[in-house]
């Protein structure tokens, strides 16, 4: 009995000693997420283990950052505005699958010579909220397998693939974008992509789509017919430089909250038609360069445009050399302060319909190189500012109403007058082209 009691006491004290002992062993085995650069500097490996001290080469904790110019970037990455011209390979070790990062922003930003990312299936993104700038400038990548990415909690995908011009394809069919609010410049500069299937993208919460497809010159088609843009406020440069697009279906676009549309289609010279008849532009303030260089367009229906809040229209149609006529009779330009070069180099344009004269403080070269333009007066290369934006004394052509059109008959010859009030004899069909007063209304005779 005594021996048994002694045994129990010994076990009791042993247990107490174990419980009170410093947790040195546990501390030594604590895992951490870190990035290690190989001795030759060309490979970055992501680990989540307790072996950091044994790794050769420099290493950084996964949450270590450096700040420059107010911008924080991962400690292992290059300066946010510089380039990493050393790293050719990135590897995610199998141990990393147990780690749950909350951000992958700028992880490989400007890794311009990166050729391969291995083990991406070990990157668990289920808790990631920010993927902005993740692969920005990775121009050396020719393929990218993101099939294991869980994006259900991501809110920011801006600049995510920007500058990845080496990619020829990108499979994002499994991406869950229901919580994403920022997609600006997401694919900008991906000039190697020839197709992009975004048919499953949920964009109901996106507010910014500016530069989203900027300079995606390799795309020849883009189906956005399912896009929900009800909350988008910024569409500037959205398709700018998409010179390969021959058609673009934007019939699903709700633009009621958009305030910026400048450069939206600039450089889309492959487009031959563009249906914007449903566009609501009541809140848009900037439209400069909107159709700049769209030389393939032969017609453009802007009848739905509400321009009452627009302040800038300079270069809006500049370089639209395929247009022969343009109806802007519904344009309200009372708040526009800049119209310079608005129709510059619209070399095939013969008619601009508008029933009102425009005024604007900045309007030099507004009609420069519009040599075919015919309005109330003949085109004069020395008169190309806003003073010629007039249906009575300039290059504008008044648009007759339906009521006026039905009255243009021989029986109404006695009701036709010149703008100076002189009565015109003869039938309407035999009169020379010009602006007349018919039954008390200004009417154009083409």
Describe each PLM feature range:
Residues 1-7:
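N-terminal secretory signal peptides that target proteins for export/translocation
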Residues 9-21:
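Bacterial N-terminal signal peptides
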Residues 26-400:
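Negatively charged
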Residues 53, 424, 443-444:
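Short, isolated positions in well-ordered beta-strands
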Residues 398-420:
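Residue-level detector of functionally pivotal "anchor" positions at catalytic/ligand-binding pockets or at interdomain
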Residues 423-430:
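Glycine-centered tight-turn motifs at strand-turn-strand junctions
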Residues 435-446:
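C-terminal tail/sorting-segment detector
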């Amino acid at each position: 009995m005594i021996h048994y009691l002694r045994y129990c006491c010994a076990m009791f004290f042993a247990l107490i000693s174990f419980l009170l002992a410093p947790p040195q062993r546990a501390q030594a085995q604590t895992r951490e997420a870190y990035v290690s650069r190989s001795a030759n500097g060309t490979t970055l490996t992501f680990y989540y283990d307790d072996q950091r001290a044994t790794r050769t080469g420099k290493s950084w904790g996964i949450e270590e950052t450096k700040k420059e110019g107010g911008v924080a970037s991962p400690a292992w990455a290059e300066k946010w505005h510089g380039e990493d011209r050393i790293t050719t390979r990135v590897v995610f070790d199998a141990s990393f699958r147990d780690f749950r990062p909350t951000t992958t922003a700028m992880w490989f930003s400007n890794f311009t010579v990166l050729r391969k990312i291995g083990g991406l299936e070990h990157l668990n993104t289920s808790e990631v909220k920010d993927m902005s700038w993740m692969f920005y400038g990775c121009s050396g990548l020719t393929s990218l397998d993101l099939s294991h990415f869980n994006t259900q909690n991501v809110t920011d995908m801006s600049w995510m693939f920007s500058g990845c011009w080496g990619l020829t394809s990108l499979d994002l069919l499994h991406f869950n974008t229901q919580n994403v609010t920022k997609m600006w410049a997401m694919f900008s500069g991906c000039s190697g992509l020839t197709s992009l299937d975004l048919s499953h993208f949920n964009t109901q919460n996106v507010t910014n789509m500016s530069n989203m497809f900027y300079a995606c010159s390799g795309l020849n088609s883009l189906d956005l017919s399912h896009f929900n843009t009800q909350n988008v406020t910024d569409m500037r440069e959205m398709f700018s430089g998409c010179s390969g697009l021959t058609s673009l279906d934007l019939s699903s676009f709700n633009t009621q909250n958009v305030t910026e549309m400048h450069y939206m289609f600039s450089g889309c010279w492959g487009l031959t038609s563009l249906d914007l008849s449903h566009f609501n532009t009541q809140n848009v303030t900037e439209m400069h360069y909107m159709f700049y260089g769209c030389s393939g367009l032969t017609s453009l229906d802007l009848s739905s445009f509400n321009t009452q809040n627009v302040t800038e229209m300079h270069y809006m149609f500049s370089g639209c050399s395929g247009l022969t006529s343009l109806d802007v009779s519904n344009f309200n330009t009372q708040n526009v302060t800049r119209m310079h070069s608005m129709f510059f180099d619209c070399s095939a344009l013969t008619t601009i319909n508008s029933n009102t004269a425009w005024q604007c403080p900045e309007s030099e070269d507004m009609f420069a190189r519009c040599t075919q333009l015919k309005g109330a007066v003949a085109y004069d290369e020395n008169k190309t500012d806003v003073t010629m934006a007039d249906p009575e004394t300039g290059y504008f052509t008044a648009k007759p109403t339906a009521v006026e059109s039905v009255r243009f008959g021989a029986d109404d010859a006695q009701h036709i007058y010149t703008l100076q009030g002189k009565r015109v004899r003869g039938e309407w069909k035999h009169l020379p082209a010009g602006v007349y007063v018919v039954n008390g209304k200004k009417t154009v005779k083409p």
